[in-house]
């Protein structure tokens, strides 16, 4: 990228000078720049342009255009190939080029020109050289330094050499306080103007018809950084304004608002602050200094160049800034309190002050150990610096003294004030010492002031127009030496006219016979009583005029002496006024004294020697009153000067008439008035009658009275029409163009322009010279306080000038508003401007009932100029938006004064919006609230970017005493240290906005809350960065999960504290939980392992301590507490995350529920595994079961804490399932514990059985028998009760209530089952009973045992009394376990299956054998069903016949065959089938038949038929057939192969049945069957019972060889 510099110098045209008004356009690379227009055939522009060139194969196209009324015409064009342009750092004399008429095109690009014209243009084109300085130039600057050092020693400085130095034309010259912050690459813009445009491209005028400012305010594709002539400037994008007092000097300094044509000045008269500042011919002193630093002969690296032509400060590696070690550099100049040479500046138009201090790159400053090159100087460089500084200071002071003497010969580039000079070389602090960054609460954001409002709007041409200033100076003295406010009032007396007399004011007849009007006794003027207040001419002056005309010389002389005395008194009493006027206009004392004499004489001469020619053009009127019945009027105008009266033509039926009529008057009396009256012409009968009676027959529409003395030059003025009397109905305004040629003042500006000159110069003097840049803030109070602009003296000056020369108060206000616009950033100024604009708005917008002129029309009639004021407001609005976009910098929270200015600035914005809406009547101007909101957001965006990029340094400075060095100051995937710091800084920003700025910016409570906007913007930006960072972290996860959790908490706190309640985010599910979800799940995974490890440790500690109770009230041990303490702590972390996303929270709860399940089941498994070993101890098993119960209790609590019914269904189901599992484990532990008492309870029940067996007697119901039964029951229960008493008392003390009930239930079960098993129903498998019978039958040797058993069986069979005792004992045991409500519930005990089984068995004891057999047959319906592994099958046919008479039943059974018999034997296999009829009432009938045996046949055929006779007592459903296949054996019991059962109820319905019956290994029966079998087994004397027990107890015999 190359930098092309083009200087458009001048041109020579062939032709008449009058026909040329030319400007030049430059085009290169789609970028276009334009000069100002200059008249004449030899125009001189002398303007510089700079372009960034990326393609050298193109050319520069130069076009010269002549401005026309409708369109512009081309004079000629020049095309210069870029390859032909020289490279140089210095301007040359330029080259004359001939303009040609046509361009040559190739591939849509210009490649040349043709057809030469006689016109020529002088251009200087060059490419800037690279930053490295040639050795020749380095030697040149070294020589310069030696000269300066020599000058310092000789204490003199050559004025000739000084005069050769050109001023630095830079807008930065106004700035008196710059601050540089080393912000690195983040805030470095290529150009201050374009930077601001890029940042906020819509901060520009919303009014399309306003003239564009000289500086560009719009961006284009590929636009040059300099769309308009750009001065050489310091890299001010690296600067920051300092204090608010100083920063205001960076604002608008001057105006170009009065007349646009004054902007296009020649190089020698260019506005000091104009945008088209000319680049000086050669390098400025700043450039010299910078280049001096850059040169070095020993070849050290030139890391950075700080040239006056560079846009920024670029380091060697391409990054902007001061280097890595420097963080901040502030260079502050002296204030301008002692600018004594300012008057010199007023006279030297081309003089532009450079900044009084330099910001130098660190690398440019040689350290104390470094020295100059040997051939240059042998002394240390620091000494040279000291010489330099002393020399410059002395020269500057000398120049100030010369300037005070008024010698204009020397340039005034050196700034005023002590030590304000170029002390950048040696007086700079040591840059290696790091200065702290500003606090977050006072963040200074880099911004470049847009030049538009500083130059284009604020160029005060009146400060430079010496001719105008000289004239205004005289007029001001004239107005102040004999002010209107001090004029002698008329001495009116009631007067009677003897002849017809007319009013001097209204020219109406003084009606009446006597006392018709008023007459002044001094000057003799006569008028109506109502008109006396309208006469404001000075009585003394009028008397002098009248006397001189009538020859009363003595009287005239007396009056003149009186006026002289009045002026002397005025001069003596108010010397400060005239001193201020002299200082403002920088007039020497001698000239001032002479001028005072001249002015006094002109006042004394009065109007006697005064003469003027007045030309009045009545242009038009607006908003007139409707006087006719048609709702309109027929207006015409009369104009009267002195006694001469003229009228316009009549415009019929128009309330906005246009006349355009010109009248000429001669006036010889400066006290005369121009009376302009508007009339409605009437031609009806009423009008004709009035014409006979009155001089005024037409309707009065309004008037304006203009003092002739207020006229000057050429004026185009709107005047509001005034009433003549209170009864007048008047509205509207009239436009007059007045040209006045006063004798001796033929070529002067209008008084409005003169007033502007006075006001601006006064403002400049009081503010910039006397106030050192500060603006005086009036302290006036009251309705007219806004009309006070200066202190008492200056205010009197402008008021008297305005009063004498007819300047409207609204014009004064708008002029002062324009002046203040250049200082709008000074303390207190926004409030004054806001009040001023509010009153300007009120003046134009608040129409009265007497006028129907719209606000827009009234404003258009403003003498200030509609376009001018609109442009001023547009550019002010633009600058206010830019400043509000950096409100944290411009209005620090730590300054209450600046905060008040911030509030006033917003009020000013609101007033501008009101102006646009009500006065300009724009349809939809930008709402002030939205503008401020956008500005706040823009500032917050910049603030966030700054704190993000400087987070570590800011945090270290604000919150830590010592900075900790970081490997990576920004975000890192290796740690998370950056983010908490950033959150802290964000909070400080939000708090500052909330506490400091929200109360200030409170004008829009419904639309703008700065604290909330701050939180919203900060959160939005933070969320983007945080989300991206965590996505990167998720890939590697180099940090601990706890670190992520801690960050999650901080983010959550930030959101809940500041973001959650924001209106814009309400109702939305926050995103931040999703960023952390994977990290939280990772933490939960790790936490599960920690919890399991902790569980094992807790159990080990508990076991080591012997599972001691945690306290006397707590019945569980420490391990439960420890486990749930750890789980609760983990859950508390999850709960405190307060996850607002229900889906993510559900994921957390599911995962944590799994952790709870694993931990608790692990606990239960360990406890269950070791529990049997602890059952031998008394208390320990109870405590362990209590632990399990406490797990369940705590789990329920945790379930509720996790949400209860609101918990995620999957997590809730998981916890419910876990609760069931724990309940099952507790049941198992209770069962194990209950079973551990089995042996002891067995012993107790056996003792009970022995005692019960000794009970004798019958079971009758006599009282004695009942008492005996109760007593026996007590005796029987004593062994059991002794055991239970001791244990249950212990259990009640040690066990939790729930655990106690479970233990009681298990003991109850064990006791009931044991009593049933031991006392009531001994098991068949015991060595007693049936098994012994079967065994004895098989082995003859056991026959004696069988006999002994049978004897014992008689004793085991319970008698009715024993049953009664046992039944009563059961009731007692039941009451014992109920324990008066403290134990098991009665309903549970009653419905207990164990008790019911026992009682059922007891009830069966009293039933007969037939009844028991019948019950067995009916209840046991599945004895042979469900044979999974049949051992064969038998085919049988059954026929059932019932006798119709007797009801007896006959059953015929035919055994057909057997099939697939599974049997192994070593000997002979001889199977046969045994068929037995089972049922009641069979004792006297044949119950069993057998077939013949078949040898060695596994599928034998029998075909044998048997007949069973059944009684009629029972139906067939009470009987069943039992088929048994056996292997016949001689001399021993037959072996059982298989069994089958066929109930006759299945046959009864059909009457017959034929089927294959599968053979099972044994008979299946339920508890009822077993109980009946046990009871019948004890009836050893009953053959049927014995046979039934044997039959049902048979099972398949053991096979041989198996």
Swiss-Prot record:
Ranges of biased composition (kind: Basic and acidic residues): 196-205, 292-306, 324-351
One Gene Ontology term from the biological process aspect of the record: synaptic vesicle priming
Database matches in Pfam families: C1_1, C2, MUN
Gene Ontology MF annotations: calcium ion binding; diacylglycerol binding; non-kinase phorbol ester receptor activity; phospholipid binding; zinc ion binding
Species annotation: Mus musculus (Mouse)
Cofactor(s) the protein requires to work: Ca(2+)
Modified residues annotated as Phosphoserine in this record: 16, 307, 379
Top-level division of the source organism's lineage: Eukaryota
Localisation: Cytoplasm; Membrane; Golgi apparatus; Synapse
Binding site for Ca(2+) 2: 628, 680, 682, 699
Species lineage: Eukaryota, Metazoa, Chordata, Craniata, Vertebrata
Record protein name field: Protein unc-13 homolog B
Function: Plays a role in vesicle maturation during exocytosis as a target of the diacylglycerol second messenger pathway. Is involved in neurotransmitter release by acting in synaptic vesicle priming prior to vesicle fusion and participates in the activity-depending refilling of readily releasable vesicle pool (RRP). Essential for synaptic vesicle maturation in a subset of excitatory/glutamatergic but not inhibitory/GABA-mediated synapses. In collaboration with UNC13A, facilitates neuronal dense core vesicles fusion as well as controls the location and efficiency of their synaptic release.
Gene assigned in the entry: Unc13b
Subunit composition and interactions: Interacts with RIMS1.
Protein family: Belongs to the unc-13 family.
Domain notes: The C2 domains are not involved in calcium-dependent phospholipid binding.
Domain C2 as annotated: residue spans: 1-97, 595-719, 1430-1557
Gene3D superfamilies the UniProt entry points to: 1.10.357.50, 1.20.58.1100, 3.30.60.20, C2 domain (2.60.40.150)
Keywords from the UniProt entry: Calcium, Coiled coil, Cytoplasm, Exocytosis, Golgi apparatus, Membrane, Metal-binding, Phosphoprotein, Repeat, Synapse, Zinc, Zinc-finger
Zinc finger (Phorbol-ester/DAG-type) residue numbers: 489-539
């Amino acid at each position: 990228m190359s930098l092309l510099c083009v200087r458009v110098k001048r041109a020579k045209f062939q032709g008449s000078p009058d026909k040329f008004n030319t400007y030049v356009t430059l085009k290169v690379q789609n970028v276009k720049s334009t000069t100002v227009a200059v008249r004449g055939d030899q125009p001189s522009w002398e303007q510089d342009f700079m372009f960034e060139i990326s393609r050298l194969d193109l050319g520069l196209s130069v076009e010269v255009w002549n401005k026309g009324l409708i369109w512009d015409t081309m004079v000629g064009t020049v095309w210069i190939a870029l390859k032909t342009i020289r490279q140089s750092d210095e301007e040359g004399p330029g080259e004359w080029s001939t303009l040609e008429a046509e361009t040559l095109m190739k591939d849509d690009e210009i490649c040349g020109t043709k057809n030469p014209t006689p016109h020529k243009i002088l251009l200087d084109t060059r490419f800037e050289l690279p930053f490295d300085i040639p050795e020749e130039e380095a030697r040149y600057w070294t020589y310069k330094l030696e000269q300066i050092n020599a000058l310092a020693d000789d204490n003199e400085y050559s004025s000739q050499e000084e005069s050769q130095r050109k001023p630095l034309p830079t807008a930065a010259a106004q700035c008196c306080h710059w601050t540089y912050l080393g912000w690195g690459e983040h805030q470095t813009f290529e150009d201050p103007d374009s930077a601001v445009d890029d940042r906020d491209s819509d901060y520009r005028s919303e009014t399309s018809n306003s003239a564009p400012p000289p500086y560009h305010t719009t961006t284009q594709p590929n636009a040059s950084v300099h769309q308009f002539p750009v001065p050489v400037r310091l890299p001010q994008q690296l600067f920051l304004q300092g204090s608010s007092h100083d920063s205001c000097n960076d604002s608008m300094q001057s105006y170009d608002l009065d007349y646009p044509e004054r902007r296009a000045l020649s190089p020698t008269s260019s506005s000091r602050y104009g945008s088209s500042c000319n680049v000086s011919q050669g390098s400025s002193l700043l450039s010299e200094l910078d280049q001096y630093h850059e040169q070095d002969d020993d070849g050290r690296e030139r890391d950075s160049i700080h040239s006056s032509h560079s846009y920024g400060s670029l380091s060697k590696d391409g990054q902007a800034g001061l280097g890595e070690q420097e963080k901040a550099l502030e260079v502050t100049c002296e204030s301008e309190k002692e600018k004594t040479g300012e008057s010199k500046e007023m006279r030297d138009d081309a003089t532009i002050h450079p900044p009084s201090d330099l910001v130098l790159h660190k690398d440019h400053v040689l350290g104390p150990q470094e020295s100059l090159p040997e051939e240059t100087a042998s002394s240390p460089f620091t000494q040279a610096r000291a010489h330099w500084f002393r020399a410059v200071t002395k020269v500057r002071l000398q120049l100030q003294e010369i300037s005070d003497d008024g010698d204009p010969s020397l340039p005034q580039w050196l700034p005023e004030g002590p030590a304000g000079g170029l002390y950048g070389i040696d007086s700079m602090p040591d840059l290696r010492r790091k200065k702290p960054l500003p606090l977050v609460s006072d963040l200074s954001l880099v911004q470049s002031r847009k030049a538009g409002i500083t130059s284009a709007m604020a160029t005060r041409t009146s400060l430079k127009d010496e001719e105008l200033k000289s004239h205004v100076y005289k007029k001001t003295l004239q107005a102040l030496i004999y002010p209107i406010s001090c004029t002698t009032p008329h001495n009116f007396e009631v007067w009677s006219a003897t002849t017809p007399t007319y009013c001097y004011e209204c020219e109406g007849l003084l009606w009446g016979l006597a006392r018709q009007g008023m007459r002044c006794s001094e000057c003799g003027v006569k008028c109506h009583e109502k008109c006396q207040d309208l006469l404001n001419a000075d009585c003394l002056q009028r008397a002098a005029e009248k006397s001189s005309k009538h020859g009363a010389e003595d009287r005239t002389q007396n009056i003149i002496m009186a006026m002289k005395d009045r002026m002397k008194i005025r001069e003596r009493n108010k010397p400060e006024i005239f001193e201020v006027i002299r200082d403002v206009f920088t007039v020497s004392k001698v000239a001032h004294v002479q001028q005072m004499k001249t002015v006094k004489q002109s006042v004394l001469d009065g109007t006697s020697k005064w003469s003027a020619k007045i030309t009045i053009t009545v242009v038009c009127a607006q908003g007139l009153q409707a006087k006719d019945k048609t709702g309109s009027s027929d207006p015409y105008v009369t104009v009267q000067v002195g006694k001469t009266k003229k009228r316009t033509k009549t415009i019929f039926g128009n309330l906005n008439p246009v006349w355009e009529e010109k009248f000429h008057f001669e006036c010889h009396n400066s006290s005369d008035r121009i009376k302009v009256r508007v009339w409605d012409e009437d031609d009806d009968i009423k009008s004709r009658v009035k014409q006979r009676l009155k001089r005024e027959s037409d309707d009065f529409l309004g008037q304006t009275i203009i003092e002739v003395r207020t006229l000057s030059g050429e004026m185009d003025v709107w005047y509001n029409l005034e009433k003549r009397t209170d009864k007048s109905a008047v509205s509207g305004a009239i436009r007059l163009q007045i040209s006045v040629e006063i004798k001796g003042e033929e070529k002067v500006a209008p008084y409005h322009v003169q007033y502007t000159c006075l006001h601006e110069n006064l403002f400049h003097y009081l503010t910039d010279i006397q106030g050192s840049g500060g603006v005086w803030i009036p302290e006036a109070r009251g309705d007219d306080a806004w009309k006070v602009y200066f202190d008492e003296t200056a205010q009197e000056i402008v008021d008297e000038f305005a009063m004498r020369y007819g300047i409207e108060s609204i014009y004064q206000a708008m002029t002062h508003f324009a002046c203040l616009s250049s200082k709008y950033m000074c303390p207190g100024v926004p409030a004054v401007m806001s009040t001023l604009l509010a009153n300007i708005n009120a003046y134009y917008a608040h129409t009265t009932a007497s006028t129907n002129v719209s606000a827009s029309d009234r404003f258009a009639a403003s003498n200030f100029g509609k376009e001018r004021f609109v442009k001023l407001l547009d550019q002010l609005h633009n600058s206010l938006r830019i400043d509000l976009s950096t409100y944290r910098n411009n209005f620090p929270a730590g300054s209450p004064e600046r905060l008040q200015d911030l509030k006033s600035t917003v009020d000013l914005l609101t007033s501008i919006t009101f102006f646009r809406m009500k006065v300009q009547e724009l349809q939809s101007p930008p709402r002030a609230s939205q503008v401020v909101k956008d500005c706040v957001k823009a500032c917050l965006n910049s603030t966030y970017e700054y704190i993000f990029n400087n987070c570590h340094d800011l945090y270290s400075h604000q919150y830590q005493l010592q900075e900790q060095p970081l490997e990576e100051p920004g975000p890192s995937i290796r740690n998370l240290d950056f983010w908490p710091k950033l959150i802290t800084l964000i909070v400080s920003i939000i708090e500052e906005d909330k506490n400091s700025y929200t109360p200030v910016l409170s004008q829009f409570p419904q639309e703008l809350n700065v604290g909330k906007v701050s939180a919203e913007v900060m959160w939005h930006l933070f969320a983007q960065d945080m989300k991206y960072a965590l996505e990167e972290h998720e890939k590697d996860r180099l940090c601990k999960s706890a670190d992520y959790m801690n960050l999650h908490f901080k983010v959550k706190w930030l959101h809940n504290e500041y973001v959650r309640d924001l209106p814009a985010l309400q109702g939305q599910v926050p995103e931040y939980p999703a960023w952390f979800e994977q990290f939280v799940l990772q933490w939960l995974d790790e936490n599960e392992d920690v919890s399991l490890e902790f569980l094992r440790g807790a159990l080990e500690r508990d076991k080591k301590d012997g599972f001691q109770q945690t306290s006397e009230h707590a019945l569980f041990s420490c391990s439960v507490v420890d486990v749930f303490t750890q789980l609760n702590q983990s859950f508390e972390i999850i709960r405190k995350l307060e996850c607002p996303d229900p889906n993510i929270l559900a994921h957390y709860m599911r995962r944590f529920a799994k952790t709870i399940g694993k931990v608790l089941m692990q606990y239960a498994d360990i406890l269950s595994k070791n529990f049997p070993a602890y059952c031998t101890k008394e208390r320990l098993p109870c405590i362990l079961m209590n632990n399990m119960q406490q797990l369940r209790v705590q789990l329920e609590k945790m379930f509720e804490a996790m949400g209860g019914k609101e918990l995620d269904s999957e997590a809730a189901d998981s916890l419910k399932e876990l609760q069931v599992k724990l309940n099952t484990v507790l049941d198992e532990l209770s069962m194990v514990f209950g079973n551990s008492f089995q042996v002891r309870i067995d012993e107790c029940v056996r003792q009970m059985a022995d005692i019960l067996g000794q009970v004798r007697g019958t079971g009758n119901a006599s009282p004695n028998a009942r008492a005996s039964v109760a007593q026996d029951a007590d005796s029987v229960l004593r062994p059991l009760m002794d055991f239970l008493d001791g244990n249950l008392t212990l259990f009640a003390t040690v066990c939790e209530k729930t655990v106690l009930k479970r233990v009681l239930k298990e003991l109850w079960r064990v006791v009931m089952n044991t009593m049933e098993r031991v006392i009531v129903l001994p098991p068949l498998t015991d060595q007693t009973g049936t098994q012994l019978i079967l065994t004895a039958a098989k082995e003859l040797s056991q026959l004696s045992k069988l006999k002994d058993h049978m004897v014992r069986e008689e004793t085991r069979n319970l008698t009715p009394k024993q049953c009664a005792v046992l039944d009563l004992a059961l009731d007692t045991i039941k009451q014992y376990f109920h324990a008066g409500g403290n134990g098991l519930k009665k309903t549970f005990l009653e419905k207990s299956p164990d008790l019911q089984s026992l009682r059922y068995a007891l009830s069966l004891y009293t039933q007969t054998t037939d009844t028991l057999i019948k019950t067995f047959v009916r209840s046991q319906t599945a004895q042979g069903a469900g044979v999974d592994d049949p051992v064969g099958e038998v085919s049988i046919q059954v026929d059932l016949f019932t006798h119709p008479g007797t009801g007896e039943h006959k059953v015929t059974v035919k055994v057909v065959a057997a099939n697939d018999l599974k049997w192994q034997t070593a000997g002979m296999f001889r199977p046969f089938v045994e068929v037995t009829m089972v049922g009641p009432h069979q004792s006297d009938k044949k119950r069993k038949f057998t077939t013949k045996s078949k040898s060695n046949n596994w599928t034998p055929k029998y075909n044998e038929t048997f007949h069973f006779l059944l009684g009629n007592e029972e139906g067939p459903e009470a009987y069943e057939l039992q088929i048994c296949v056996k292997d016949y054996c001689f001399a021993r019991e037959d072996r059982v192969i298989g069994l089958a059962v066929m109930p006759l109820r299945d046959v009864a319905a059909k009457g017959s049945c034929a089927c294959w019956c599968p053979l099972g290994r044994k008979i299946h029966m339920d508890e009822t069957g077993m109980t009946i079998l046990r009871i019948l087994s004890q009836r050893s004397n009953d053959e049927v019972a014995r046979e039934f027990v044997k039959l049902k107890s048979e099972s398949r015999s053991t096979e041989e060889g198996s």
